[in-house]
Amino acid sequence: MIQIGKIFAGRYRIVKQIGRGGMADVYLAKDLILDGEEVAVKVLRTNYQTDPIAVARFQREARAMADLDHPHIVRITDIGEEDGQQYLAMEYVAGLDLKRYIKEHYPLSNEEAVRIMRQILLAMRLAHTRGIVHRDLKPQNILLTPDGTAKVTDFGIAVAFAETSLTQTNSMLGSVHYLSPEQARGSKATVQSDIYAMGIIFYEMLTGHIPYDGDSAVTIALQHFQNPLPSVIAENSSVPQALENVIIKATAKKLTNRYRSVSEMYVDLSSSLSYNRRNESKLIFDETSKADTKTLPKVSQSTLTSIPKVQAQTEHKSIKNPSQAVTEETYQPQAPKKHRFKMRYLILLASLVLVAASLIWILSRSPATIAIPDVAGQTVAEAKATLKKANFEIGEEKTEASEKVEEGRIIRTDPGAGTGRKEGTKINLVVSSGKQSFQISNYVGRKSSDVIAELKEKKVPDNLIKIEEEESNESEAGTVLKQSLPEGTTYDLSKATQIVLTVAKKATTIQLGNYIGRNSTEVISELKQKKVPENLIKIEEEESSESEPGTIMKQSPGAGTTYDVSKPTQIVLTVAKKVTSVAMPSYIGSSLEFTKNNLIQIVGIKEANIEVVEVTTAPAGSVEGMVVEQSPRAGEKVDLNKTRVKISIYKPKTTSATP
């Protein structure tokens, strides 16, 4: 155990322990040489540091991994020894291993399972071309990054544990579920052994569980080369036959029926979901041939001698003549060969009978291995009664949607019906939660959180509910604006159909319109609706005789400007107001009628504020009735409501006739 916070090997600051394998501990560390980059440091456990076989295997496999530079293989960055401790540093993959991912998301959609398996195959193709067989492929040794990239790790390093401690049977349970039939018989692992393991992993991705299980490694290993592979389609009806055929061929028990290389499997897998293979027949192999069978080793002498001896009964004839009696040391002539052969045969036969009897006695002392009854279609109560009657215990109850099985009835058992298990084994029940489809409602205008909760209640997986945000000034943040599947659509839970909800979010930018000529009250209301703060809308009034009061004459910023409502930018609107003062026109030389009409109708002076006076003196050339003076004078400001205008009209004096 390395102390947390310690600087290991002069460059790795240990942050925490993140894993513990069969022979090594794994720590998250920061590489001080690479500016604190996070790495995973695997250290051979103390009790293996003195084992030359374990150390040699650890080093050999670490170097082999270091040669595998591939985007789908965990990269080795450093190999070394520190204070007698063998270690290797590798890239840190922040994500889940495939085992946990399957547990949380099973069954995976066909497309996702194919995508992940293609990545694993690409990684193993490189390894196999370099002469490296993994020997321990399982979901726990496949890591998934947050973006869904698969990375294979632990290239056979854990095999050193099996080599140096063969008696640790329980430690093999993690891998025996993916063990090829030839490995179970004791043969050497090959490229096709890795292919078999990938077939089992593929089965698990599409069904959510392993095909073979049991109480011991031996029981599971026997199933790998004795029991046919359970149907994938029976477990997951959405899987097409062409895709199941890939698994059937990858897990064929005879090597001659199995894919010869990962490239061959990759090509077949790549077209398994294509339209051209939609009517493919189920692949069936004759697995009865014994060509791949390996002869089991003979029973050792120590085993035979452990069988209790039985004293043979012999017939003693009376000796008529005592002198003819002989002692043990007395020489006796050998019996004829034929007689000796018969005696040996009888002794061998008796020994075999004793061995058989001993085995029967031993087996009778152990719990019987019996087939799990088929309880599919039964109610939970009926299934429990049937299993208890067969001397099985009841395990967990899980629910699963089903179009075929009525709600509350059994879909299947785990392990499956017909599988051999010992009495007392716990059998899990998979119970139908009802049909796999429902009608899509109208979600527009509703809160997205309520819609998501409703979809989850209807068993739609989280990864199939996609939220896309869109800025909106009209709708409250979090409100559903659009939905990808229209109201009334029948949604099939068995298919990985994505539901896309477009949800409103607070808009931060708007496009300013052309507000000139519009009423200022309407424009201010519109800007407020678009979340423009009221204190940033400035109104400036300007007198205008051409525009109706309240009408916008100018704006800043101009029309079409992108305005960020999160920034304190002021919008200035120049609004027309009624004219209250004007410059006094010049009316000198005009007639009284014209002057009054112009002042009232054009300038806006009230008639009551116009005073007309007559004067008798005027500039030369003036005619009667002409304006000769005005007050205010031309150009002076006139308040239309207050100023009195005085107009002087020339009226010459009349001269009386002299008598």
Curated annotation (Swiss-Prot):
Cytoplasmic side: 1-342
SMART domains: PASTA, S_TKc
InterPro entries listed in its UniProt record: Kinase-like_dom_sf (IPR011009), PASTA_dom (IPR005543), Prot_kinase_dom (IPR000719), Protein_kinase_ATP_BS (IPR017441), Ser/Thr_kinase_AS (IPR008271)
UniProt keyword terms in alphabetical order: ATP-binding, Cell cycle, Cell division, Cell membrane, Cell shape, Competence, Kinase, Membrane, Nucleotide-binding, Phosphoprotein, Repeat, Septation, Serine/threonine-protein kinase, Transcription, Transcription regulation, Transferase, Transmembrane, Transmembrane helix
Main location: membrane
Region listing for Disordered, in residue ranges: 541-561
Catalytic activity: L-seryl-[protein] + ATP = O-phospho-L-seryl-[protein] + ADP + H(+); L-threonyl-[protein] + ATP = O-phospho-L-threonyl-[protein] + ADP + H(+)
GO biological process, one term: establishment of competence for transformation
Summary of activators and inhibitors of this protein: StkP is activated continuously during growth and its activity is inhibited upon growth arrest. Inhibited by staurosporine, a known protein kinase inhibitor.
Pfam families per UniProt: PASTA (PF03793), Pkinase (PF00069)
Positions in the Periplasmic compartment: 364-659
Influence of pH: Active over the wide range of pH from 3 to 9.
Post-translational modification: Autophosphorylation occurs predominantly on threonine residue(s) and weakly on serine residue(s). Dephosphorylated by PhpP.
Active site: D136 (proton acceptor)
Domain-related comment: Consists of an N-terminal kinase domain, a transmembrane domain, and a C-terminal domain containing four repeats of the PASTA signature sequence (Penicillin-binding protein and Ser/Thr protein kinase associated domain). The C-terminal domain binds to synthetic and native peptidoglycan (PGN) subunits and to beta-lactam antibiotics, which mimic the terminal portions of the PGN stem peptide. Deletion of both the transmembrane domain and the PASTA domain negatively affects the stability of the core kinase domain.
Any further remark recorded for this protein: Strain Rx1 is unencapsulated.
The protein's assembly and partners: Homodimer. StkP forms dimers through its transmembrane and extracellular domains. Dimer formation likely promotes autophosphorylation activity and might be necessary for targeting StkP substrate. Interacts with PhpP via its kinase domain.
Protein name: Serine/threonine-protein kinase StkP
Source organism of this protein record: Streptococcus pneumoniae
Gene encoding the protein: stkP
